[in-house]
Amino acid sequence: QITPERIAINLDDARLADNEGVIRNDVPIVVGGPVAYESTLPIKEFVTAINGAGVPAAVSLSAGAFMCNHIFYVAQDRLKGTTVRSGFVHVPLMDEQAGEFPGLPTMSLDQMVKAVRAMLEVL
């Protein structure tokens, strides 16, 4: 399902290395930054619109503590004090990727496109 994220937390806590081979455990993303930021996107309206387009979606409380959360937090931190709305939306793997990542959820690209269009219509 498509999951717009509600909260980004100021924490990197990963068991896996990032693309540069660095494992960040229990460290703040921005030293001295707020504990968390909320999405400034209309996430509940997104979910209603996505579901209305026939695509499964639900609000997710948190993007976790790895790369997705890191990107979400940095975006919110850099855009604070502006009128630019931002957030993070998780999408599953494409169906074609199922063999590479057994057991992880997948969705057709057509369904993902429907979801993105539904969110854009909300904006």
Where does each model-flagged region fall?
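Mid-sequence, gly/pro-rich, charge-dense loop/helix-turn segments that line enzyme active sites
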Residues: 1-62, 68
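Active-site-adjacent mobile loop/cap segments within catalytic or ligand-binding domains
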Residues: 66, 70-122
